[in-house]
């Protein structure tokens, strides 16, 4: 929605661009940041635990109110209560969840079955990023892993447990 760098595009610029795109795109996915500086990159490269959850929700709400295109929002949204609130409040039409699904691959099923308390939460440590493609980060290249889901990145080494029936 905004680059957060001097001279970068703003939320107003984004709304103007979205209005131009009306009738030509199916969905606007709202995020913030830029790779133009380390500070702005913190908003782009998966918000860490030091960022508030859902830090893009307000911009998504502003964009949704201004245009007639479905809006999705991303950014530290792995908690079931937050996902429900975004949709219920009309802040966005859809939520984009990545790290939350790495931590808990069955997040949609657990929410749909009425068991959000069983969701293994993403702790937003960003250990899942491989850092092979992210500029401005000093991390060594390695295979992606998850601090709370030990199977992630090793699915071929683990077989799905079979439930016995009585």
At which residue positions do the language-model features occur?
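Flavin-dependent oxidoreductase catalytic cores
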Residues: 1-166
